[in-house]
Regions:
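Extracellular serine-dependent O-acyl
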Residues: 291-338, 345-362
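Surface-exposed acidic, glycine-flexible loop patches that form ligand/cofactor-binding
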Residues: 126-128, 223-233, 281-287, 360-361
Length: 362
């Protein structure tokens, strides 16, 4: 058995598919959850070389072999060489996917994950089959996979309790033989974050590669650049936003406080409706032919009717028959995960609902 030799950059391997909204060529910068690389390799052993860094929240990497997850590792600061498999049959194709498990970390400018290259010796790379569809998922902590790992009673907000592999975006994409990308941030919403911080909202950053990141290094890596929508047009965009808005607004109501300068819930709904319509316009302009599905309800139905009416109203006003609202299954005591978030079972149930809905549309 030959030993792995030099590290070869992904740019030098055209058979390797880069996943997610990324930047870089020789070194691939992974920002969002679910970003990574995918390839088919015939050798007995292969390693991936990555650079990692963080101040508070370390990046985690998931390794999938022939459709089954075989590894999940936290990464140390600096250079890491992760063996993906060793001692397997030479000449037999192995389908490998490596995914970033942790979301883009807005509150940790030191958070970094880069794929430097692959190290191998005795095999060849084969062409991947073309994905049947391209799907984009936009959301909050649910879409980021918060709570899909860990015991139910866990409350600490740490990287370990996030997982791209255990989320409905990955499940839906795999069921439909699709390539997917994710734009999501825990605690963020349409018009406000869970704590009432109106700066923490996804829509203003949608048209950038990963504009919600902070720090000079992220800027230098291209996170704040305009995203090239034409280079990767999705067949469907699935949005799951509103849970954090509902939390913030309901908290203000219960405490008798103003939100956005008003105590009038109907005025708040108008603000929410306007923001939803504005965001749908941006998503449609960016993805002219995509089916757009706004899903909601995995953590309760507060403001569900307002969100549904906003989405369906916009579709009607614009005569856009490719915009839809889908009520998602609520999380139950049997399907809850850590941090009082939907667990993997909840994601499996939701994934099936979205998969079935997409099959009717695509």
């Amino acid at each position: 058995m030959e030993q792995p030799t030099k590290i070869v950059s992904v740019a030098a391997l055209p058979q390797v598919r880069v996943l997610g909204r990324t930047t870089g060529t020789d070194v691939v910068n992974l920002f969002w959850t679910g970003s990574g690389i995918e390839f088919i390799y015939t050798g007995s052993e292969i390693q991936v070389a990555v650079n990692a860094d963080y101040d508070a929240y370390e990046p985690w990497l998931a390794v999938e072999l022939n459709g089954v997850q075989i590894g999940r590792v936290p990464l140390n600061k600096g250079k890491n060489e992760v063996c993906l498999f060793r001692g397997m049959t030479v000449g037999k194709p192995k389908h490998v996917r490596i995914l970033k498990e942790v979301q883009a970390m807005h509150q940790d400018p030191g958070h970094l994950l880069q794929i430097v290259g692959l190290q191998y010796a005795d095999g060849e790379f084969q062409q991947l089959p073309e994905p049947k569809y391209r799907l984009e998922f936009v959301g909050d902590s649910i879409t980021s996979g918060e709570g899909t790992v860990g015991a139910i009673y866990e409350e600490d907000w740490i990287s370990a309790f996030f997982s791209a592999m255990n989320t409905y975006p990955r499940m839906v994409a795999d069921a439909l033989s699709a390539e997917y990308r994710v734009v999501s941030q825990s605690g963020w919403g349409i018009v406000t974050g869970w704590d009432g911080n109106v700066e923490n909202k996804i829509p203003p950053f949608y048209t950038q590669v990963c504009g919600l990141l902070t720090g000079e290094r992220n800027a230098s890596l291209g996170a704040l650049q305009d995203y090239d929508f034409e280079a990767w047009q999705p067949d469907a965009v699935i949005i799951n936003l509103g849970t954090n808005d509902a939390t913030a607004i309901q908290s203000a109501v219960e405490l008798g406080q103003e939100w956005a300068g008003t105590r009038d819930v109907e005025e708040v709904k108008e603000i929410l409706t306007t923001a939803i319509c504005d965001f749908l316009k941006v998503v449609r302009n960016s993805n002219p032919t995509a089916q757009i599905i706004w899903g909601y309800g995995m953590l309760g139905d507060n403001f569900l009717s307002a969100i549904r009416e906003a989405v369906e109203g916009y579709a009607e006003q614009t005569a856009d028959s490719r915009i839809h609202f889908l009520q998602l299954p609520d999380t139950t005591p049997d399907t809850v995960g850590s941090r009082l978030h939907p667990g993997m079972k909840a994601h499996q149930i939701t994934a099936k609902e979205i998969e079935t809905y997409l099959q009717e549309l695509l």
